[in-house]
Amino acid sequence: MDKLNDSSFSKLIERVDYLTKYELKYTCKKIKSRIEKLHLDEILDLRNTKYENENNIIYKILLKHKNILTKVILEFKDINNSHINKFTDKLTFINLNYCQKIDNDALIHIANTCHNLTHLELYIIPSLSDEGLKEIIMKCPKLIYLNLSGCSHFGEGSLLLLPKYLPKIEFLDLTRNYGLTDKCVEEIVKECTELKYLNLYALPKLEMNFLKNINCINLEFLDLCGNQNVTDEHFKKASDKINNIKKLNLSWCTNLTDKTIEYMFSMDKNKNLELISLHGILGITDKTIDILKNNKGILHNLNTIDLVACSNVKNRDNKYIKNIFKNVECFQVFF
């Protein structure tokens, strides 16, 4: 290992499970020194690890190393609030995706303890509600990354606090947050001007009027999949403010037409586009291809385009598309 540079050493150690990493650390002084120098002992990532008596082992790791850890990834682990209670203010990155035995008390502990938190993921935890989330929003002022995908019990009681307490948030995933209202989204996109990622996948009841007042000039990712209320007129208004989009998912937004593409991508607008999904939109025709190919930036940057079930695009054969957009390698998107 002495011959490995720091980058190679880091990649090697990151592939080792946490317990083995610590055995190495306390077996060899040189390895210990490099692990500490590169802060590799600060990361607890158990995504690809499975232990016998796992909950007990995770608890002991959190207890023993709580004053070292800055990043914990415990997604899909069967942990509970007792594990969360070992979190300290050292943590800046927490991934609790699908940890379905935690509840609002866990969020309240994080809010009261982890004031340096910048990254929080809470994918599909049905027991969570506004009671816990509002504490996170009000007490974790450094938070810029928030994944709430599949948490269906959040609503105005917490999400309306985002613009006031987290105006600099950059990443927000609200997929299947069925308590989300148009009022919430309108306030968020008007005041959270640093947003780069906004996911509103599978929220068909949103009226989409927020697009007329969007103020997120740095937005790079927007997912509106499945919304049949969004229209060309919404994008006509939004196109004045959205000019840095890289990934746009409009799958099954069936009221859209070529006009949306014209508003968003003509005259070299949004020239950094890398991915676009228009899956299932009958209002899209060959004119859309013409608009995209006349944008020189898109001609170079586009690598993914989904035209599946766009039956009014007559020339949508993969070879034909590839001949126009040389860097396209993917023709169907799965979000």
Language model regions located:
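Phosphate-coordinating loops and pocket residues in cytosolic domains that bind phosphorylated ligands
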Residues: 14, 266, 294
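Conserved hydrophobic beta-strand positions in leucine-rich repeat
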Residues: 44, 72-74, 92-97, 117-123, ...
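Short, solvent-exposed loop/turn at the beta-strand->alpha-helix junction
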Residues: 50-58, 76-84, 100-108, 126-134, ...
